[in-house]
């Protein structure tokens, strides 16, 4: 597990490097599906002092199997998403400013241009609010459930992120680094959408044919963006 712990540590350290977190407001995890184990950031540990060996290993029930610290308080959310979507290899949660602003506003992040379409096939969705019962009960587990309720049976890697109402963004990917990459893009397109709609409140969504072209040339079966 040392290799995965190092990967998760590096991905977590990317959060402050890319300006996605303030203090300890974020966490990254990754899963080893063969072993049924998840590596995640420890709860409340400062990035300045954190080391790879501080990463916590839990099983799919959330039981700590390796590590001296308690795992992230959002662990149950991560585990619920891993259980539901086998294509996910890494998950990240932050309170990055612009994506969180859309979450607090209770609005999807609209697909307005090609930067968005290169990564997200359509609007970045938002969840409903959790009920008082859901919050007072198994809050973090129910956060995962409301994300799943919103995504349904869609392929999560086609829209690798969501904003949880009144909370903040979650993003995911094929591994921990891919998840952070998508979280960075999510923050950038959230900022772009806010600025664009401020300039032109009547701005329409990106044309569907342009969205299809940009997404499929990068992610489709005949993708030709980048190198093999």
Swiss-Prot record:
Broad enzyme group: isomerase
Cofactor annotation remark: Binds 1 zinc ion per subunit.
SUPFAM superfamilies cross-referenced by the UniProt entry: AraD/HMP-PK domain-like
Keywords attached to this entry: Carbohydrate metabolism, Isomerase, Metal-binding, Zinc
Domain of life from the UniProt record: Bacteria
Protein residues bound to substrate: 26-27, 43-44, 72-73
Required co-factors: Zn(2+)
Binding locations of Zn(2+): 74, 93, 95, 167
An example Gene Ontology CC term for this record: cytosol
Entries under CDD domains matching the protein: Aldolase_II
Pathway in which the depicted protein is active: Cofactor degradation; L-ascorbate degradation; D-xylulose 5-phosphate from L-ascorbate: step 4/4
Disulfide pattern: none
Catalytic activity: L-ribulose 5-phosphate = D-xylulose 5-phosphate
Active site: residue positions: 118 (proton donor/acceptor), 225 (proton donor/acceptor)
GO biological-process terms attached to the record: L-ascorbic acid catabolic process; pentose catabolic process
Entry's EC annotation: 5.1.3.4
Induction data: Induced by L-ascorbate. Repressed by UlaR.
GO molecular function annotations of the record: aldehyde-lyase activity; L-ribulose-phosphate 4-epimerase activity; zinc ion binding
Pfam families xref list: Aldolase_II (PF00596)
HAMAP family documented for this protein: UlaF
Similarity field: Belongs to the aldolase class II family. AraD/FucA subfamily.
Function description: Catalyzes the isomerization of L-ribulose 5-phosphate to D-xylulose 5-phosphate. Is involved in the anaerobic L-ascorbate utilization.
Name of the featured protein: L-ribulose-5-phosphate 4-epimerase UlaF
Gene designation: ulaF
């Amino acid at each position: 597990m040392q290799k995965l712990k190092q990967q998760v540590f590096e991905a977590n350290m990317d959060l402050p490097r890319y300006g996605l977190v303030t203090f300890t407001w974020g966490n990254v995890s990754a899963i080893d599906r063969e072993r049924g184990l998840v590596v995640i950031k420890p709860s409340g540990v400062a990035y300045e002092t954190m080391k790879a060996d501080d990463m916590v290993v839990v099983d799919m029930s959330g039981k700590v199997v390796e590590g001296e610290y308690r795992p992230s308080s959002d662990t149950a959310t991560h585990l619920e998403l891993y259980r539901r979507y086998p294509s996910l290899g890494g998950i990240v949660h932050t309170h990055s400013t612009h994506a969180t602003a859309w979450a607090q506003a209770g609005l999807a992040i609209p697909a307005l241009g090609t930067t968005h379409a290169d990564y997200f096939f359509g609007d970045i969705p938002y969840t409903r609010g959790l009920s008082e019962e859901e919050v007072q009960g198994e809050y973090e587990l129910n956060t995962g459930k409301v994300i799943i309720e919103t995504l349904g049976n869609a392929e999560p890697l086609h829209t690798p992120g969501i904003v949880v109402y009144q909370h903040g963004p979650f993003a995911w990917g094929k591994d921990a680094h891919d998840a952070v990459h998508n979280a960075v893009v999510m923050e950038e397109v959230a900022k772009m959408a806010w600025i664009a709609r401020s300039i032109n409140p009547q701005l329409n969504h990106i044309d569907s044919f342009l969205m299809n072209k940009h997404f499929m040339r990068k992610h489709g079966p005949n993708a030709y963006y980048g190198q093999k």
